[in-house]
Amino acid sequence: MNQTTHRCGWVALIGPPNAGKSTLLNALIGQKVAIVTSKPQTTRNQIVGILSRKDAQVVFMDTPGIHQLRGRLNKMLLQTAWQSMNAADALIVMLDGDLYIRKPDLLDRDIAPLVEPIAAETRPVVVVVNKIDLFRDKSKMLPLLERLSAMWPKAEVFPASALNKDGMDHLLRLIVGYMPEGPALYPEDQISTLPVRFMTAEIVREKVFNKLRQELPYSTAVDIEQWEEEEGRDQVIVNAVIYVARPSHKSMVIGKGGATIKEIGIEARKDIQELLEKRVHLELWVKVREGWTEDLGFMRSLGLSPDE
């Protein structure tokens, strides 16, 4: 009697900032495990999402965008991305097709740290050219696809839309086929290895970014200071602190008469309740901590620093 082969392995999602890696991860898992904003470089940790099927379990690692910026926080983000890449059985390189079709000269700049490592890879590599939903005339993508195929001849290059889930079935067939044979590493109902407190903090941070968009710089972090589950009540009490680097940033987050932080709290509470499947009492506070993006000890306390 033949038994169906079960496969299990790790996949790293890498690429420049704002390519859509977190949107892709959520689309592949079928649930929200990574925050999604319109601002680049919002993924700071290695976000792990788990897809379980009868024939396979794939553990996806969403990583901070690979870029060449300076500063201790940015160097830490880059280190996290490379660590995930080294641990994977296969790689997905995510690129913003819309950006590089409109501005092809930016491609060399944005993928410079990836060109040689990907060309030398012996593991399977899939290059996903994302955001094809923005183009009615698909022939406009051909020059970019041909350029990438010539750059990385061993990789599988194809267009997709993480937002509309176009190409996801094809991507999953490829990825599952690349995974080594083996039993599942996690229970089939587990979709992430992240603690719920961390995911809660990420939801709050997502709402801050989306609410303030271009006005707020990246020097924002969220820490859960209190987490209390009341016995006999289907409710969780959460107190979260939003850290900013300047007093002027604090005013932005709070807003006139507290209007902005109230809206952030309402939107965050909704998503947290969906995550926990419980009622949530959420209190948000804003504190100034100048220079925190260069304070390695503080970043470690927030769980932002990778193992060294």
UniProtKB/Swiss-Prot annotation:
Source domain of life: Bacteria
Subcellular localization(s) per the UniProt record: Cytoplasm; Cell inner membrane
PROSITE patterns in the cross-refs: G_ERA, KH_TYPE_2
UniProt-listed GO biological process terms: ribosomal small subunit assembly
Record-listed GTP binding positions: 15-22, 62-66, 130-133
Era-type G domain location: 7-181
Mode of membrane association: Peripheral membrane protein
Record-given protein name: GTPase Era
Organism in which the protein naturally occurs: Nitratidesulfovibrio vulgaris (strain ATCC 29579 / DSM 644 / CCUG 34227 / NCIMB 8303 / VKM B-1760 / Hildenborough) (Desulfovibrio vulgaris)
Underlying gene: era
